[in-house]
Amino acid sequence: MANIKSAKKRAKQTVVRNARNVAQRSMLRTAVKKVIKALDANDAAGAQAAFAVAQPILDRFSARGLIHKNKAARHKSRLNDRIKALAAA
């Protein structure tokens, strides 16, 4: 255990930030899964609505450094491609 005051503070901050990051990462995964679930159900309107919710979450978390910007771009691109293919079919 840390003895120095600043090290104790850093340890507390790490716990709080870790809890926040876990919750936000879970929210992100849930948003992406909702889009995928709508796509699997062939629900174009539902997928589009879920994507409209997931896209700003991906952007926000990539800007904050929670996920890499390329990962966010890859998710958005692949989901959007699937939505377009479903709408065209």
UniProtKB/Swiss-Prot annotation:
GO terms for biological process: translation. Keywords: Ribonucleoprotein, Ribosomal protein, RNA-binding, rRNA-binding. GO terms for cellular component: cytosol; small ribosomal subunit. GO terms for molecular function: small ribosomal subunit rRNA binding; structural constituent of ribosome. InterPro entries: Ribosomal_bS20, Ribosomal_bS20_sf. Binds directly to 16S ribosomal RNA. Belongs to the bacterial ribosomal protein bS20 family. This is Small ribosomal subunit protein bS20. The lineage of its organism: Bacteria, Pseudomonadati, Pseudomonadota, Gammaproteobacteria, Lysobacterales.
